[in-house]
Amino acid sequence: MNDTLVIAGKHYRSRLLVGTGKYKDFAETRAAIDASGAEIVTVAIRRTNIGQNADEPNLLDALPPDQFTILPNTAGCYTADDAVRTLRLARELLDGHALVKLEVLGDPKSLFPNMPETLKAAETLVKDGFEVMVYCADDPIQAKMLEEIGCVAVMPLASLIGSGMGILNPWNLRLIIDNAKVPVLVDAGVGTASDAAIAMELGCDGVLMNTAIAAAGQPVLMASAMKKAVEAGREAFLAGRMPRKFYSADPSSPTAGLIGS
């Protein structure tokens, strides 16, 4: 089945995107990402060395850009100006790379997005030639505004970053999905494989996660589980689930021709 994720005109086989933080070392990072099957890996530019610090280990030695699509992100940014400045630095470090993940946080406790600053940054970045995938609240109106600005994907949170609380508001996610003309990916809050499957069954185009894999007891094994969950959820969405029924007068096995009837 030729069913690919298309972002900014590029096709990807995997619908699972993964982060690179919180692992014990770069070797574990690489092993988990290999197990996940992810092709897009996101990197926090303010926290991870991809060349800006020559004396420190470079993540790109473990995850070469010719093997993965590197997605720089603005984790740790609380203003539009900080986010724009960070992504311009990333573009320099990655030789003009345009695909980026924008997140502008509202408060350090919840890490909930600051949507006015996110909208402001998105507008600046799109005008500056970036292809913006954007972390946002699960607000259908604001998600549509980001799409209309020109973002190439909208990424509403399922629940708070790092919380592992799963899909808390499936109805808003469905509204965003139904209204969108760009890919919709769940970003933040996934805790285990069933959460990823549910997101895909709702019709999300993909799932981005980090802590759910990196903080698992066995990150490499969890990465493999997430790969399978995303694939299963996507196939279930495409197949179409049976209607929900409170009672069923339609048994699975036919009643005609029963012995003794």
Swiss-Prot record:
Its EC number is 2.8.1.10. It catalyses: [ThiS sulfur-carrier protein]-C-terminal-Gly-aminoethanethioate + 2-iminoacetate + 1-deoxy-D-xylulose 5-phosphate = [ThiS sulfur-carrier protein]-C-terminal Gly-Gly + 2-[(2R,5Z)-2-carboxy-4-methylthiazol-5(2H)-ylidene]ethyl phosphate + 2 H2O + H(+). Catalyzes the rearrangement of 1-deoxy-D-xylulose 5-phosphate (DXP) to produce the thiazole phosphate moiety of thiamine. Sulfur is provided by the thiocarboxylate moiety of the carrier protein ThiS. In vitro, sulfur can be provided by H(2)S. Coiled coil: none annotated. The gene is thiG. It is found in: Cytoplasm. Homotetramer. Forms heterodimers with either ThiH or ThiS. This is Thiazole synthase. It comes from the Bacteria. GO terms for cellular component: cytoplasm. The keyword Heme does not apply. One of its GO terms (molecular function) is thiazole synthase activity. Keywords: Cytoplasm, Schiff base, Thiamine biosynthesis, Transferase. Belongs to the ThiG family. The active site is at K101 (schiff-base intermediate with dxp). It holds the Pfam family ThiG. The keyword Metal-binding does not apply. Pathway: Cofactor biosynthesis; thiamine diphosphate biosynthesis.
